[in-house]
């Protein structure tokens, strides 16, 4: 989405949340190069940035209730984010102004989902 291009270019968006892929296919391996594009599958498609994957972790987001659960990729332990300042910080790392902005986006794009289960992919800029 175009709204995420400026924070990716500025280096403030360093993560993305994706639905899990079917079967054994992965989005990316830790340490692997990622190419971040905008307008995929259109004539306006362009590369935004090349980055390296820093982590891939299962994630659940309680959109209505206001929580995020991330399972650590290195130790398998889950931690839950509930405090407003921590939710705001998480949302900013994903390219949003704050948790309310992120929640509104999720409600508009996934109106029937109260709890989203997917994958959190983080990256570093080489």
Regions found by a protein language model. Give the residues of each.
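Catalytic phosphate/metal-binding cores of nucleic-acid and nucleotide-processing enzymes, i.e., regions
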Residues: 1-126
């Amino acid at each position: 989405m175009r709204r995420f291009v400026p924070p990716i270019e500025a280096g403030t968006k360093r993560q993305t949340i994706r639905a899990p892929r079917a079967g054994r296919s992965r989005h990316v391996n830790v340490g692997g190069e990622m190419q971040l594009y905008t307008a995929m599958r259109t004539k306006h498609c362009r590369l935004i940035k090349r980055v390296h994957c820093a982590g891939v972790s299962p994630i659940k987001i309680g959109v209505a209730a206001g929580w995020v659960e991330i399972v650590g990729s290195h130790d398998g332990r889950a931690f839950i984010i509930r405090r407003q300042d921590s939710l705001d910080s998480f949302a900013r790392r994903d390219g949003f102004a704050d948790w309310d902005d992120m929640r509104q986006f999720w409600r508009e794009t996934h109106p029937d989902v109260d709890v989203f289960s997917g994958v959190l992919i983080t990256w570093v800029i080489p």
